[in-house]
């Protein structure tokens, strides 16, 4: 518990400090591929109009906005993040979108009732949570039976040429971007290590299953640099079945 608390405080500090440059940093680090990946994930999700969605670790609300457009005026989207400064950036971007609500909260202790959402997403945020399984179990808890959870995250490339390039990029190029946009060595080192140490696609699939998700689907993007994991909360069985 003490370790988790220290880790939370460290991550909170990082994102409080990089909030104003986060979007720019994300675009540069991913060569704007994160936008392409998100569009492909949204296509896989086939979000229904009028749905209620939760975007965990919403950051500056990019995925929250995409979900808002997908659910339409009759739907509702809540974006949750633990960084007040990240949410301030998100609030500016979503101020004219009436079906979005942004709230501060902890991904490991979601402030919502059981069985509340049709969709729960987390984009490039799971790697920054001290305990992946606790966060995934919380996502499962707040989903309605049969609801969909989706994670878009960096991954570990399996194709040799991508794997070598990825390792070189993280070792030599990413620190340069970090120094330009982060305010301290600790911040850019965290951004680098959290992505580099994140589970590969098969390991994360196993964690999804451990958290209770069924029919978990996995899609890799750009040679495995990023991956989508999509799973469902088990449907309730009718009494007498």
Curated annotation (Swiss-Prot):
GO terms for molecular function: demethylmenaquinone methyltransferase activity. Pathway: Quinol/quinone metabolism; menaquinone biosynthesis; menaquinol from 1,4-dihydroxy-2-naphthoate: step 2/2. Keywords: Menaquinone biosynthesis, Methyltransferase, S-adenosyl-L-methionine, Transferase. It holds the Pfam family Ubie_methyltran. PROSITE patterns: SAM_MT_UBIE, UBIE_1, UBIE_2. The keyword Ion transport does not apply. GO terms for biological process: menaquinone biosynthetic process; methylation. Its EC number is 2.1.1.163. InterPro entries: SAM-dependent_MTases_sf, UbiE/COQ5_MeTrFase, UbiE/COQ5_MeTrFase_CS. It is an enzyme of class 2 (transferase). S-adenosyl-L-methionine binds at residues 60, 81, 106-107. It catalyses: a 2-demethylmenaquinol + S-adenosyl-L-methionine = a menaquinol + S-adenosyl-L-homocysteine + H(+). Belongs to the class I-like SAM-binding methyltransferase superfamily. MenG/UbiE family. Methyltransferase required for the conversion of demethylmenaquinol (DMKH2) to menaquinol (MKH2). HAMAP family: MenG_UbiE_methyltr. This is Demethylmenaquinone methyltransferase. It comes from Staphylococcus carnosus (strain TM300).
